[in-house]
A protein has these predicted regions:
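Short, glycine/charged-enriched secondary-structure capping and boundary segments
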Residues: 1-2, 25-29, 53-56
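Active-site nucleotide-sugar/metal-binding loop of Leloir-type enzymes
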Residues: 1-10
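Catalytic-core segments of class I nucleotidyltransferases/pyrophosphorylases
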Residues: 11-12, 19, 25-32, 45-46, ...
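Small/polar loops that bind or transfer phosphate-bearing groups
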Residues: 15-16, 40
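A short, conserved acidic/glycine-rich loop-to-beta-strand motif
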Residues: 34-44
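A structural signal for short hydrophobic beta-strand segments in well-ordered beta-sheet cores
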Residues: 51-54, 110
Length: 145
């Protein structure tokens, strides 16, 4: 896409496997007020599995069924400046290499998103998301028809 972006311009980037109601206008505004090359939306999410704590003898001392994770995740809605292309080397992983490289130069920001986010990585998630859509109860649908 580099040939389609003007030098000095910013552009939006997202993954194709997540749905969210990220406020794009606020994301762009946050990106523009900082001196970064890229900004991604970050949110808390729930564990896909039950989380346990154990004592030294492996006796379970607590069990939290699919509790909220402590750290935030990149939920995949991003604003990038043209300069991001200076950090991309060939066909390496954008998440594993490019974003880490940008972060190492103190040019990567995270925009706090406290709204809806759901990845669609499994068949079960696809069924649930399609059900929400069919029931006209999709939290990510923030536009009017």
């Amino acid at each position: 896409i580099k040939s389609e972006i003007e030098k000095g311009d910013s552009f939006m980037l997202t993954y194709g496997d997540g749905l969210s109601n990220v406020d794009i206008s606020k994301l762009i505004k946050f990106h523009k007020k900082n001196d970064g090359v890229a900004t991604f939306s970050a949110t808390k999410t729930k564990s896909r599995f039950g989380v346990i704590e154990t004592d030294k003898q492996n006796l379970v001392t607590s069990f939290d069924e699919k509790g909220e994770l402590e750290n935030r995740i990149n939920c995949g809605f991003m604003v990038c400046d043209y300069e991001v292309f200076n950090y991309i080397n060939g066909d390496e992983s954008f998440e594993q290499k490019t974003l880490k490289n940008i972060a190492s130069k103190n040019k990567l920001y995270a925009y706090d998103h406290n709204g809806y986010f759901q990845p669609m990585d499994t068949y079960r998630e696809a069924i649930e998301l399609n059900k929400l859509w069919k029931e006209n109860n999709a939290p990510w649908k923030v536009w009017n028809d």
